[in-house]
Regions:
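Alpha-helical membrane insertion/targeting regions
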Residues: 1-212
Length: 212
């Protein structure tokens, strides 16, 4: 039962990540003066800071797409070289998109409260991902896998944020800028808490499985 739930959760996570990543391709039209599905708040940020904003918006989906496959034990075992190279691409995408996000957070449409939240997310995203990469280089694979869980929890904020936007409208907020002061925190803090709970439970199960 537990394995089935875990498998279904992985499938749901992958599908949501793929959907958001593909939807983000609409930002590629912005340099050509087209704004498909891009609201005025986001458009304003892109028009004011096109390079840093588009770097974040077009590179982050790469990490979002790659991430779920890095957690598949069968892929790691059968194709270790592919796992390593896709992991390098993931790390590079997180760092580049994180730097773009950090630079853009300074001018968040939701003001300084939103800017601080998104800036903190970017700093943690870069730091945790680089820590996971360093652990892999040092062959500390248990720590590497733990930090990669937290890294992808931060990456997955792109999905969580979009899932929460309809809630904002239901609560009476009239646009993204009005919601972003709380989305800047609720998009990623619950993800981190969920990973912390999951990792602690996994550690307890592993300890119980060790014969006395």
């Amino acid at each position: 039962m537990g394995q089935r739930v875990s498998r279904l959760g992985m499938i749901a996570m992958t599908l949501l990540a793929a959907g958001v990543a593909l939807y983000s391709l609409r930002f590629a039209a912005a340099p050509f003066g087209a704004w498909p599905g891009i609201g005025p708040d986001i458009r304003g940020v892109i028009e004011q800071f096109p390079v840093r904003a588009l770097i974040h918006m077009l590179v982050a989906p790469v990490a979002l797409l790659i991430g779920p496959f890095q957690f598949l034990p069968s892929l790691r075992a059968r194709f270790p070289r592919l796992h390593r190279w896709s992991g390098r691409v993931y790390v590079a995408a997180c760092v580049i998109a994180g730097l773009g996000g950090l630079a853009t957070a300074l001018h968040a449409s939701g003001g300084p409260v939103a800017g601080f939240g998104f800036g903190l997310l970017a700093v943690l995203w870069i730091g945790v991902t680089l820590g996971a990469w360093r652990a892999a280089v040092q062959r500390r694979f248990q720590r590497h896998r733990l930090l990669m869980r937290f890294s992808y929890a931060l990456t997955f904020a792109a999905v969580t944020l979009r899932l929460q936007i309809p809630i904002g409208f239901a609560l009476g907020y009239d646009g993204y800028a009005a919601m972003s002061p709380w989305l800047a925190y609720t998009s990623w803090i619950p993800n981190v808490i969920a990973v912390a709970i999951y990792s602690a439970a996994a550690q307890r199960r592993a300890a119980l499985a060790v014969p006395a």
